[in-house]
């Protein structure tokens, strides 16, 4: 199928409208769609596009040998390939896979000062060495974090209009349940998205074929590619330990207590044995880390128990690819999430919150039954968010709302495989509405 519309498209258009725009660095994990998005934008907006990939074209690493000025770099690019034409104010220079040549970031200052050519850089695993890139280009670049497709982008790919999405938000704002037909349709679409994840190549293949056939092979290959990246780029750390941590995540999430435990990585494993591994995976964009609050109250920063956290895979489709063969067959044949239902729903919600710009926080105490899956905040409140694989009553949430101790909590949000509803101070939304939470929070009156 053709190009899949992405939210990054609108960001790129706004970036180009800015007369004082800086060179742009687009970060994101492998295969989230960075290169195709940039290429499409470039074709539609520039007369000349100079694309250099530092993995497939390592010969271009010499372009800084005479210095980092825009003039020197343009001259050497032209010497390597005289067919590349540089026309002032009509040319985009696209440096791809810069994780293999972070030195190019030094040139961004000089391209900004030159002002005659637009520059976009992109790469995977940039977070791993981003301090270095950031320090040599501070003040002369704009950063943009790109993720795999969220559920809204999946709906666009399936042909759904902005009108349909606006109608979903109206149901949330007005507290009106979806019709039975709508509920079934959107729930089925949501299950498709959960099984596939948001990697554009996988989504595109599924829509073209109208079947899950082949999707698991693509997911498995991506999982292999991620693990190969760990081996290639994990410098200064024990690569085997990082791999072990990454491979343990599905089992960690399958536990009733989803707190990350190093004893589940290896027998007798301790946090000091795996120092830096979780941080590396987070910086690489492969996982999302949910921090445990010491107390369910504001502020969030400075209120974290650093010894406790949960770890989620950054794309739920990659988590699905890690499941056992029997579950894979059942998922694709019957859309049955089985014993992994709780893990997949929770991973999806974590992923959706991150893609909306929220930090991840939860609450749990070893000597208490009081616990919450996630928290988000409004202007005046801390809002607990519960992920319910079944229809239980959210006892912890009600206890927090009624508590005289935790006065920052007055309302709650429950996400489940049900319909829209309001009961006392708790609003309930179906999982397929999760991507709209930030817009809901910005427009509703309940939490103001």
For every predicted segment, state its role:
Residues 1-17:
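N-terminal pre-Walker A segment at the start of P-loop NTPase domains
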Residues 34:
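Conserved lysine of the Walker
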Residues 37, 41:
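Hydrophobic positions on the alpha1 helix immediately C-terminal to the Walker A/P-loop
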Residues 56-89:
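Short glycine-rich substrate-engagement loop in P-loop NTPases that contacts/grips substrate
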Residues 94, 118-124, 145:
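Structural recognition of the conserved hydrophobic beta-strand(s) that form the central parallel beta-sheet
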Residues 131-254:
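Interdomain motor-coupling "hinge/lid" segment immediately C-terminal to the ATP-binding subdomain
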Residues 204-371, 375-379:
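Accessory nucleic acid-recognition modules appended to NTPase machines
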Residues 389-429:
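Catalytic cores of nucleic-acid endonucleases
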């Amino acid at each position: 199928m053709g190009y899949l519309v992405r939210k990054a498209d609108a960001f790129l258009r706004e970036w180009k409208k800015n007369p004082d725009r800086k060179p742009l660095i687009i970060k994101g994990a492998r295969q989230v769609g960075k290169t195709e998005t940039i290429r499409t934008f470039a074709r539609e907006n520039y007369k000349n596009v100079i694309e250099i990939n530092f993995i497939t074209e390592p010969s271009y690493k010499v372009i800084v040998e005479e210095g980092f000025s825009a003039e020197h770099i343009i001259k050497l690019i032209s010497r390597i390939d005289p067919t590349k034409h540089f026309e002032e104010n009509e040319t985009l220079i696209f440096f791809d896979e810069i994780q293999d040549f972070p030195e190019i970031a030094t040139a961004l200052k000089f391209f900004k000062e030159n002002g005659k050519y637009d520059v976009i850089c992109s790469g995977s695993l940039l977070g791993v060495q981003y301090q270095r890139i950031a320090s040599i280009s501070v003040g002369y670049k704009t950063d943009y974090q790109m993720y795999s497709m969220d559920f809204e982008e999946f709906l666009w790919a399936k042909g759904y209009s902005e009108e349909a999405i606006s109608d979903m938000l109206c149901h949330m704002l007005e507290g009106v349940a979806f019709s039975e037909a709508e509920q079934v349709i959107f729930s089925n679409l949501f299950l498709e998205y959960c099984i596939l994840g948001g990697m554009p190549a996988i989504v595109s293949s599924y829509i073209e074929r109208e079947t899950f056939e082949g999707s698991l092979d693509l997911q498995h290959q991506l999982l292999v590619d991620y693990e190969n990246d760990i081996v290639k780029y994990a410098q200064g750390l024990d690569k085997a330990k990082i791999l072990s941590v990454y491979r343990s995540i599905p089992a960690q999430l399958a536990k009733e207590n989803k707190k990350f435990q190093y004893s589940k990585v290896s027998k007798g494993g301790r946090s000091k044995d795996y120092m830096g591994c979780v941080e590396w995976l987070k910086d690489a964009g492969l996982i999302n880390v949910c921090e445990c609050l010491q107390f369910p109250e504001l502020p969030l920063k400075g209120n974290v128990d650093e010894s406790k956290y949960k770890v989620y895979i950054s794309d739920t489709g990659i988590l699905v690819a890690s499941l056992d063969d029997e579950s894979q067959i059942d998922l694709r044949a019957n859309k049955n999430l089985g014993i992994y239902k709780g893990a997949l729903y929770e991973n999806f919600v974590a992923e959706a919150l991150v893609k909306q710009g929220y930090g991840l926080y939860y609450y749990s105490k070893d000597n208490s039954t009081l616990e919450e899956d996630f928290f988000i905040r409004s202007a005046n409140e801390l809002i607990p968010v519960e992920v319910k694989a079944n229809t239980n009553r959210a006892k912890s949430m009600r206890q927090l709302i009624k508590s005289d101790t935790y006065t920052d909590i007055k309302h709650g949000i429950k996400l489940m495989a049900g319909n829209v509803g309001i009961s006392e101070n708790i609003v309930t939304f179906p999982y397929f509405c999760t991507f709209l939470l930030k817009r809901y929070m910005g427009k509703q009156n309940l939490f103001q």
